[in-house]
Amino acid sequence: MWGDELFDPGLTHLEKPHPVMVENTPYREGHCFLGLLGKHYNVPTENFGIAGGSLQSSLWTYLWWLEHEQLDPRECLILVGHTEGNRDSFYNPRHVSYANDPPWNKFVHSAWIHGGATCFDSDWVTMVKANMVLTNCNELSNLAYRQSVLFFEGQNFKFQNNVIQFTTMGPSIPINAKGLLWPEHGLVSFVKDNPELLAPNKHPNERGHEVIRDHLIPEIERVILA
């Protein structure tokens, strides 16, 4: 959803270019599958994905959106992309916002710590790593995934069937829930066996996001026409 590895070719001259740069946001959000869907339907989109996010942070971010959105949620089409259940997020009330920080991002994601991010003090690093050692297991991943799917299924009923769910990497367990697409595989299955659709680190490239968009359009049409 976020658009890892989508980088504006016009910015490659910058020192240490990275997709997270604010200068790259219009390109990244415009070429990821959510932005492409917005162009297809000629409607505005809001992308709340974040690199390294978790099922928990997605839920917290969604609740932030509900509190701040000025439109009636029933007038919105809500797409929920579930990541892997073995990721964790922790709320940091002392988070220092940077220029590229959205207002809802006060999280420390385990993926950042395990990936070697250097912007966290030793207390966070120790706590996140200890949490993984003490709690990481398939049972907890399955619980996190089930909790997320069933929460958003409830939102789907509340808002009259305008919530579409899917997984990105694939589900840890199959779940049948109203509004959940492809309960036994994730979006990655549409691109993973086609090198021409992948960026160097195996995220979808621009063409890969177009393929994902094309798989989602019929499902969105079904919801719109229902």
Task: Walk through the language-model features, giving the residues of each.
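Serine-esterase "nucleophile elbow" of acetyl-processing enzymes
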Residues: 1-60, 68
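Alpha-helical cap/lid subdomain in secreted, periplasmic
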Residues: 63-226
